[in-house]
Amino acid sequence: RQRVHAAHLRRVALGAALSKVGHTVRYGMRTPSKRPEDGLTFADAVGFAELVVVALPYGAVEEVLAPLELEGALLIDATNPLGWNEGVPVLAPPKEGSAGEQIAALTGARVVKGFNTFGAEHCAGGTIEGRPIDVHLASDDGEALEVVSDLCDELGLRPIPVGPLYRARATEQLAILWIQLAIVEGRGRKLVFSLVEEN
């Protein structure tokens, strides 16, 4: 089983789901708990992990990740570079590329973009209208992509590889659309984007 570090925003949902299927999860935080199962420093959590999940507000990414030893680490990037304009969610991308590409450049990690295009509660799997929840995955590393795809299968989710890491730009746009439809327009958090193919 993978030892996993999940950070901040989606940590409870994804961490709980991974724990439920047998993985050992530790959480990184600025102010660690006295109990390791509740939270470690970011550095200690990364040192423990075979897989790191980054689920931070994008504005905190550089501050948190830059000091960490992540070169070559397997890392899931679940961040979205989000801003708001008069109550409407807008993409606030880095100067070049996507959040996923920036995290890869910053850390030297083997980044898989994923778990960022639906509500956190869907990390635990399940179906909507009889269809599994799709997880859009972008990565330049085939082995890392395979590991994360297998995790999706374990969680009862359907991995949908969408291509190289630069495709993270598209999934981050999709996340903004999800926020607009599900939250701003009030369609509800059960809304997901599903790939439907004719047999």
Regions found by a protein language model. Give the residues of each.
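Active-site-lining helix/loop region of Rossmann-like oxidoreductase modules
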Residues: 133-199
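NAD(P)+-binding Rossmann beta1-loop-alpha1 motif at the extreme N-terminus of oxidoreductases
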Residues: 1-40
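Short beta->alpha connector loops
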Residues: 57-60, 117-119, 141-142
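Rossmann-fold NAD(P)-binding glycine/threonine-rich loop
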Residues: 79-127
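Conserved dinucleotide-binding and phosphotransfer motif residues
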Residues: 21, 48, 155
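Rossmann-like NAD(P)-binding element
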Residues: 42-74, 78-86
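Short, structured coil segments at secondary-structure junctions
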Residues: 35-36, 71, 107, 155
